[in-house]
A protein has these predicted regions:
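Histidine/acidic residue-rich metal-binding segments in metalloenzymes
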Residues: 1-81
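Short amphipathic alpha-helical segments
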Residues: 21-22, 93-95, 169-170
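C-terminal cap of metal-dependent C-N hydrolases
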Residues: 99, 152-181
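Short gly/ser/thr-rich secondary-structure transition/capping motifs
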Residues: 63, 137-141, 174-175
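His/Asp/Glu-enriched, well-ordered alpha-helical/loop segment
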Residues: 1-4, 53, 72-75, 79-81, ...
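A short acidic, glycine-rich active-site loop
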Residues: 54-65, 101-105, 177-181
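Glycine/Thr-rich phosphate-binding loops of Rossmann-like dinucleotide-binding domains
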Residues: 17-18, 41, 89-91, 166
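Short, glycine/acidic-enriched loop or turn micro-motifs at the edges of active sites
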Residues: 14, 37, 87, 162-163
Length: 181
């Protein structure tokens, strides 16, 4: 606040962080923040399996934290969703839990997981799309070019009534390190 600068908080994973971000936004501090699909969709309960695909930084947190992240998005304290896409080779993720690197892939499952979790919490499909598009663009100061007849466009067609199951065959990344499959 003193410098009138801005700060972006990536990978928010705890209720305490959401509370602090909310507090400073109310004070007028130029703070933006993001959450990851895995932090709004998974909890520390997945860690009991010692599956290295669930080893991320920051780590998966409690159900209380997960619900606070969702509330933070819906109320506007959190600005966007970012995948934290972190592919690792099979050999790296087959190491024991302590020595395996942190990270999981996230691009292919990001929207499906986020949409499922957030629409159950009351968000619209349109709002979920905005958290992946307009939210990051606003943080970066980028203009989103409106859809206009005769002009180039970046679009995605989403039928939220179609059931989709994330499978290993959908993965186009360097590795398959995802707890979602």
């Amino acid at each position: 606040d003193y410098t009138r600068g801005r700060i972006h908080i990536p990978h928010v994973s705890t209720k305490r962080s959401v509370d602090l971000i909310r507090k400073y936004k109310k004070m007028g501090v130029n703070v933006t923040a993001e959450v990851t699909p895995h932090h709004i969709g998974l909890t520390e309960n997945k860690l009991t399996e010692y599956d290295t695909h669930t080893k991320v930084a920051p780590p998966l947190r409690s159900e209380l934290d997960r619900k606070a992240l969702i509330k933070g998005l819906i109320e506007g304290s959190i600005n966007c969703i970012a995948t934290d896409h972190a592919p690792h080779t099979i050999e790296e993720k087959e190491m024991d839990f302590i020595h395996s690197p942190c990270g999981m892939i996230g691009l292919e499952s990001a929207f499906g997981l986020s949409h499922t979790v957030l629409t159950k919490a009351g968000a619209s499909t349109e709002k979920v799309v905005q958290w992946f598009t307009k939210g990051p663009a606003d943080i970066m100061g980028w203009n989103i070019i409106p859809f206009q007849i005769g002009e180039p466009a970046e679009i995605a067609i989403i039928d939220s009534k179609i059931r989709w199951t994330f499978k290993k065959s959908h993965i186009q990344s360097k590795s398959k390190n995802s707890p979602m499959i």
